Amino acid sequence: MGEQNKLYYDVEKLVNSLQESFDLDCAQSVSLFTSKSRSNEAWLEELENKFKLKDDVELDDVENLRAEIDMKLNMLEDKVSYYERLYKELEEFQNEIKIKTVVNNRRQSRTPI
């Protein structure tokens, strides 16, 4: 029985040692986590003071303004496209008039007056 008691005592001692080591590791982890959490909270507070967030009304106003600008930009793009097409048509018309003028001048120069 003496050897069994010693074995039981050694196992109990080993379990206690492991428990102490585990408890120490847990305490260190909790301490590190707490320290980092506090550091992150301080950093977050610093960022909040440095960069003020816009409230929902201001964000909605910005979004509405962006939508309005997009709409105006689309209208301008449509107008530019229209004027580009008009320019091409006028250019074609001008070329046709030049050709007709040349043809008409040749025709008039051939007929005796």
Swiss-Prot record:
Residues 57-97 form a coiled coil. The keyword Transport applies. Keywords: Coiled coil, Endosome, Transport. Pfam families: BLI1. Transmembrane segments: none annotated. InterPro entries: BLI1. The keyword Coiled coil applies. GO terms for cellular component: endosome. It is found in: Endosome. Belongs to the BLI1 family. Component of the biogenesis of lysosome-related organelles complex-1 (BLOC-1) involved in endosomal cargo sorting. This is Biogenesis of lysosome-related organelles complex 1 subunit BLI1.
